[in-house]
């Protein structure tokens, strides 16, 4: 019994000593994080979709803060995120990356053809924002409020029952198409 007590005390003291050494080393040799990278990363939507050309939001934030990468490449964040990053970095806002259609992007949503869904859960595993709900061997569905339209759930589906479609127009996302309004110059008479 005496040997067990000695062993427990010795191991406790060793664990305490090594814990203190590790604690000291972690503070002494800590690498300082760039606060600008953290701030840019907080502004990004954290969908980890890769549409910007980087494997996730953190690498894109590092490229923007340290390497001067363009601030307009986050498709899910769109113009609001680009404006916030421009304000944070004190740079001029840029037009969104891509063609003219990207300036007013159409919100895309994943839609599951539910009768053809086999419930394999591969789309659930691929979704970075947990917008797909369902269970193994049960029908899955997409929560449209959470879906960012990142397209990461489409390829893993073995039955190709997922596709991206434009979001339905509602009063929340409707915008007036100014190109449909006829513009006429109205002559104004000048009175003396």
UniProtKB/Swiss-Prot annotation:
Cell inner membrane among keywords: yes
Localization annotation: Cell inner membrane
Record key words, sorted: 4Fe-4S, Cell inner membrane, Cell membrane, Electron transport, Iron, Iron-sulfur, Membrane, Metal-binding, Repeat, Translocase, Transport
The 4Fe-4S ferredoxin-type domain, residue ranges: 108-137, 138-167
GO molecular function: 4 iron, 4 sulfur cluster binding; electron transfer activity; metal ion binding
Positions annotated to bind [4Fe-4S] cluster 1: 49, 52, 57, 74
Alphabetical list of Gene3D superfamilies matching this protein: 3.30.70.20, Electron transport complex subunit B, putative Fe-S cluster
Domain 4Fe-4S: start-end pairs: 32-91
Biological process, per Gene Ontology: electron transport chain
Sites where the protein binds [4Fe-4S] cluster 2: 117, 120, 123, 157
SUPFAM superfamilies named among the record's database cross-references: 4Fe-4S ferredoxins
PROSITE patterns (alphabetical): 4FE4S (PS51656), 4FE4S_FER_1 (PS00198), 4FE4S_FER_2 (PS51379)
Cofactor(s) demanded: [4Fe-4S] cluster
Main location per the UniProt record: membrane
EC code: 7.-.-.-
Keyword Hydrolase: no
Cited InterPro entries: 4Fe-4S_dom, 4Fe4S_Fe-S-bd, 4Fe4S_Fe_S_CS, 4Fe4S_Ferredoxin_RnfB, Elect_transpt_cplx_RnfB/RsxB, RnfB/RsxB_Proteobac
Region Hydrophobic, residue ranges: 1-26
Annotated GO CC locations: plasma membrane
Cofactor annotation remark: Binds 3 [4Fe-4S] clusters.
Amino acids binding [4Fe-4S] cluster 3: 127, 147, 150, 153
Assembly mode: The complex is composed of six subunits: RnfA, RnfB, RnfC, RnfD, RnfE and RnfG.
Family: Belongs to the 4Fe4S bacterial-type ferredoxin family. RnfB subfamily.
Function: Part of a membrane-bound complex that couples electron transfer with translocation of ions across the membrane.
PANTHER family, A to Z: ION-TRANSLOCATING OXIDOREDUCTASE COMPLEX SUBUNIT B
Name of the protein described by the UniProt record: Ion-translocating oxidoreductase complex subunit B
């Amino acid at each position: 019994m005496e040997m067990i007590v000695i062993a427990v005390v010795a191991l406790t003291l060793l664990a305490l000593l090594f814990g203190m050494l590790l604690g000291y080393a972690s503070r002494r040799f800590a690498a300082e994080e760039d606060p600008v990278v953290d701030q840019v990363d907080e502004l990004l939507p954290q969908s980890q979709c890769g549409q910007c050309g980087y494997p996730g939001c953190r690498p894109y934030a590092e490229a923007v803060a340290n390497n001067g990468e363009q601030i307009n490449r986050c498709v899910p964040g769109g113009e609001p995120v680009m404006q916030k990053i421009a304000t944070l970095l004190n740079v001029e806002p840029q037009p969104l990356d891509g063609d003219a259609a990207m300036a007013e992007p159409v919100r895309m949503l994943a839609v599951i053809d539910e009768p053809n869904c086999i419930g394999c859960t591969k789309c659930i595993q691929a979704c970075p924002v947990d917008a797909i709900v369902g269970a193994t061997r049960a029908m899955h569905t997409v929560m449209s409020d959470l879906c960012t339209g990142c397209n990461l759930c489409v390829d893993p589906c073995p039955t190709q029952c997922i596709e991206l479609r434009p979001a339905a127009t509602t009063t929340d996302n409707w915008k007036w198409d100014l190109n449909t309004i006829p513009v006429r110059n109205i002559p104004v008479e000048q009175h003396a």
